[in-house]
From Swiss-Prot:
It is a peripheral membrane protein. InterPro entries: ATP_synth_OSCP/delta_N_sf (IPR026015), ATPase_OSCP/d_CS (IPR020781), ATPase_OSCP/dsu (IPR000711). It is found in: Cell inner membrane. It comes from Citrobacter koseri (strain ATCC BAA-895 / CDC 4225-83 / SGSC4696). Belongs to the ATPase delta chain family. GO terms for cellular component: plasma membrane; proton-transporting ATP synthase complex. F(1)F(0) ATP synthase produces ATP from ADP in the presence of a proton or sodium gradient. F-type ATPases consist of two structural domains, F(1) containing the extramembraneous catalytic core and F(0) containing the membrane proton channel, linked together by a central stalk and a peripheral stalk. During catalysis, ATP synthesis in the catalytic domain of F(1) is coupled via a rotary mechanism of the central stalk subunits to proton translocation. This protein is part of the stalk that links CF(0) to CF(1). It either transmits conformational changes from CF(0) to CF(1) or is implicated in proton conduction. One of its GO terms (molecular function) is proton-transporting ATP synthase activity, rotational mechanism. PROSITE patterns: ATPASE_DELTA (PS00389). Keywords: ATP synthesis, Cell inner membrane, Cell membrane, CF(1), Hydrogen ion transport, Ion transport, Membrane, Transport. This is ATP synthase subunit delta. F-type ATPases have 2 components, F(1) - the catalytic core - and F(0) - the membrane proton channel. F(1) has five subunits: alpha(3), beta(3), gamma(1), delta(1), epsilon(1). F(0) has three main subunits: a(1), b(2) and c(10-14). The alpha and beta chains form an alternating ring which encloses part of the gamma chain. F(1) is attached to F(0) by a central stalk formed by the gamma and epsilon chains, while a peripheral stalk is formed by the delta and b chains. Its main location: membrane.
Length: 177
């Protein structure tokens, strides 16, 4: 987890509450996603780590974002720049997404496998996780050859390791003890 999570949480909460109040959650998520990508730009990263005055930095950042930010999004950027927190934007986005998922009673579930899973396998995993978590789930699938076979499922703090690699690691631990 990033060092900015604690810093990002209040900004994400404020943005989320505002977005819900104004029925613009999707728009806010899009704005935050775009702004988070801008912070990853090499030239912008140099500006963010430089010694620019907060007002100058905010206006430069807003100029780069252009029409992607509405007036309220620009105000968030100004406040974050004033507090030297623009580097936390990717974490603000992440926290915003978590808040949205919680409000919509959905959970992000990461499924890592050695090969692409069939629709039937994904449906079974989705159904099992929905039952276990008592909420809707959104599967994010990744392929990692080092898993060898099986799957690793992550949902928040919960990890279900049904991979051959995981079994081999547990066997090695038992043999070493």
């Amino acid at each position: 987890m990033s060092e900015f999570v604690t810093v990002a949480r209040p900004y994400a909460k404020a943005a989320f509450d505002f977005a819900v109040e104004h029925q613009s959650v999707e728009r806010w998520q899009d704005m935050l996603a775009f702004a988070a990508e801008v912070t990853k730009n090499e030239q912008m990263a140099e500006l963010l780590s430089g010694a620019l005055a907060p007002e100058t930095l905010a206006e430069s950042f807003i100029a780069v974002c252009g029409e992607q930010l509405d007036e309220n999004g620009q105000n968030l950027i100004r406040v974050m720049a004033e507090n030297n927190r623009l580097n936390a934007l990717p974490d603000v986005l992440e926290q915003f997404i978590h808040l949205r998922a919680a409000s919509e009673s959905t959970s992000e579930v990461e499924v890592t496998s050695a090969t692409a899973l069939s629709e039937e396998q994904l449906a079974k995993i989705s159904a099992a996780m929905e039952k276990r978590l008592s909420r809707k789930v959104k599967l994010n699938c990744k392929i990692d050859k080092s898993v060898m076979a099986g799957v690793i499922i992550r949902a928040g703090d919960m990890v279900i390791d049904g991979s051959v690699r995981g079994r081999l690691e547990r066997l090695a631990d038992v043999l070493q003890s």
